[in-house]
Amino acid sequence: IPTNWKDDVLLENYAYGHMSQGKAPGGWVMKMSPDGKNREIITMGFRNPCDFALNRDGELFVYDADMEYDIGSPWYRPTRINHGISGGDSGWRATSKKWREYFPDTVGSVVDVGPGSPTGVIAGMNARFPTHYRDALFICDWTFATMYSIHLKPNGSSYIGEKREFISNSDGSLALTDVVIGPDGNMYFCVGGRGGQSYLYRITYTGSESTELSQLDTTSEHAKARATRRKLESFHGSANGEALGVAWTHLGSEDYHIRYAARIAIEWQNPKFWAQKAYSEKNDLA
């Protein structure tokens, strides 16, 4: 995460409800070494994420909450899946200060899910399920008693997603709290809370569809775009003499997430080396 951000807003803040004085950066995801000594915030700007997962490409996805007090307001943000890219700010702020989807410095959602209470998240890669489920994420909604499968499709160096109902209970008595894939390839999930009965369930696939993993994409234009973005992300977190030369040409990329990674790489460099270059830049995207 760059060090030059602040909890600032140009427009008047309409404060109401609980968390009305919540401060940036909101929720965040941290990477740390096994001994806990080296810690680094990777991505931020969430409301209340309980869980996240990594897909087969090693990309991070965060299931973030909505704010119930905002429902019906122009700045309401539904629960959603966010791509947790390095240096990313997903723009959640208290009350009306939320960053709009069209802001150039926010990371948009991969797929909006809707009102709910996000809990557990797991990638399906180790499940003994049909192939299309092994490439999916599984997310739990406590409030509406539903587990969704999220099917990701590459979109440049990022993804877009499709949500599909995987399991649900129409009477609401399936308050999902967490989900795992066991070493046997079956899915296990638990429910409970707020005075409700707790249960542990197992889901086993017994059909005839193939359960083989699909071939991992390493050669497509999307895979190459992800590699470019990751190269730029390698400059995040510290000054590097090569960063400006590599990143500057990508500031005008048609790929939003590559532009984003390039900008963060440059923000980690001393402005005295690039401020004048920024003033003279002619590319509107850059």
Name these PLM-found stretches.
Residues 1-235, 265:
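Beta-propeller domains with acidic blade repeats across secreted/periplasmic ectodomains
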Residues 25, 243-244:
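N-terminal alpha-helical segment
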Residues 49, 244-248, 274-278:
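Buried hydrophobic core positions in alpha-solenoid tandem helical repeats
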Residues 106, 132-133, 246-248, 256-258:
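Glycine- and acidic
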Residues 225-239, 249, 257-269, 276-280, ...:
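Structural detector for internal amphipathic alpha-helices that build alpha-solenoid repeat scaffolds
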